[in-house]
Amino acid sequence: MERALILSGGGARGAFQVGVCQYLQEAGWVPEMVCGTSIGAINAVAIGSGMKLEQMAHFWKIYDRRKMFRITMLRFILSLFKLRKFSPLMDPTPMRDLLSDLVDLDALRESRQEIIITAVNLKTSQLRYFNHNTIDIDHVMASAAVPMIFPWQFIEGEPHWDGGVMDNTPIIPALEHGAKQIIVVLLSPVGAANLSLPQSHLQVMELMFEHSLIGAYETSMAYRASRNKPQPLGRSDHPPATLPFNNCREDQCIATVAPDRMLGFRSFFNFSRPQVTQLIREGYNCARKQLKGLIQ
């Protein structure tokens, strides 16, 4: 396998990935595998089902967010105080209806690209990978079922939720398939740039949360490096995951594309047209800058 594209989770920040994909298409870089989790899973499945990037961008900008995010606040509050059975914040029905209209499952199963999405089994705590031959709407809903926000979904009778809980950047399938060029699209600059120290409690919380999202990816990269050059216990000298195609060995190179600024907590749930438009533009510009002269 030559090329793989990895799409991280990150809620509304997923619009950034559309811009990155627009640049990759323009550059003639077509992945044979696309792996995604959470919002990255939705984008991956859209790509695998044959949706044009122009359609994806249009969809991101125009869908009715008020219908999409139907809040069940009273049930949620009552469940917090144990006055009734646990209830998530959002009603998943609008998202299920949207995905049913958006995703052509027949086209997805016939895709020439390997599409892989993830979800976590609540009972076994197992991170599971599903490919395009088996994916249906339940799998996509499960991968995007952010805990507390959306309810877990049942796959083969077992409850599953957001794969990003355990691995927000699912690079392992690409590594295992021996992809020679891997482009990883992060939805945060954390792990992709040197950052200023946080100056407020909110910034501390934001950075802590971002670190939790990048952790599994950093661990995967450290493991990959250690297979080539064993490190003493407690030490990891693997190159930063951020350096475009600098994380290379003889038979494999990994590039990272990421925003060049902190996006803030609100960006996770801000599906407004202004933010979507801005993030698509930033995704394109960051990819052009960070991958210039490095993809072929």
Where in this protein do the model-derived segments appear?
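Catalytic nucleophile loop
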Residues: 8, 31-49
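Conserved small-residue
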Residues: 10, 20, 40, 99, ...
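A short alpha-helix-loop-beta-strand transition element characteristic
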Residues: 68, 103-114
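ATP/pyrophosphate-binding catalytic subdomain of soluble kinases
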Residues: 141-179
